[in-house]
From Swiss-Prot:
Protein name stated in the entry: Protein-export protein SecB
Gene Ontology annotations of biological process type: protein folding; protein tetramerization; protein transport
Gene3D superfamilies associated with the record: SecB-like (3.10.420.10)
Subunit structure: Homotetramer, a dimer of dimers. One homotetramer interacts with 1 SecA dimer.
Pfam family, one: SecB
Main localization of the protein described in the UniProt heading: cytoplasm
Subcellular location: Cytoplasm
Role summary: One of the proteins required for the normal export of preproteins out of the cell cytoplasm. It is a molecular chaperone that binds to a subset of precursor proteins, maintaining them in a translocation-competent state. It also specifically binds to its receptor SecA.
NCBIfam families noted in UniProt: PRK05751.1-4 (NF004393), secB (TIGR00809)
Assigned keywords, A-Z: Chaperone, Cytoplasm, Protein transport, Translocation, Transport
Length: 156
């Protein structure tokens, strides 16, 4: 009964999704357009979160895409997609998962669309990023944190 009451008190809502920062660079254009297109795509991603008020959090998903063609940078695109979320009455582990995996999963399609649009506006072939398993990334992060804590010498 107590679990049911606690579950009813938990709440989650999206307050706002916004573009926080964007950058597109094509340092080797227009000569890049004259080469055969055989891209090497590198994706880096990162998430950050901070509390804005009681139960209100900002989560920022940063995606950096670097595409090289014949060892030269064709373009570099960076997007910081932000969101403001209400996440109330959650246990610490639930909140960490919500901010570290669930919210980035919501933000990713927006960031992916922005990157795709920027790439097309740069007149490069369309880039469709594959979905990201943020749950798996979050679990890997928790495992690495646990291993670091286990390996750290304890103070006696």
């Amino acid at each position: 009964m107590a679990e049911a009451a606690q579950a009813q008190q938990q709440n989650f809502a999206i307050q706002r999704i916004f573009l926080k920062d964007v950058s597109f660079e094509a340092p080797n254009s227009p000569t890049m357009f004259q080469k055969e297109w055989n891209p090497d795509v590198k994706l880096d991603l990162d998430t950050q979160s901070r509390e804005l008020g009681e139960g209100v959090y900002e989560v920022v998903l940063r995606l950096t895409v670097t595409v090289k063609n014949e060892e030269e940078t064709a373009f570099l695109c960076e997007v910081q997609q932000g969101g403001i979320f209400t996440a109330g009455q959650m246990e610490e582990a639930q909140l960490a998962h919500c901010l570290g995996a669930f919210c980035p999963n919501i933000l990713f399609p927006y960031a992916r669309e922005t990157i795709s649009s920027l790439v097309v506006k740069g007149t490069f072939p369309q880039l469709n990023l594959a979905p990201v398993n943020f749950d798996a990334l979050f679990m890997n992060y928790l495992q690495s944190q646990a291993q670091e804590n286990a390996a750290a010498p304890s103070e006696a």
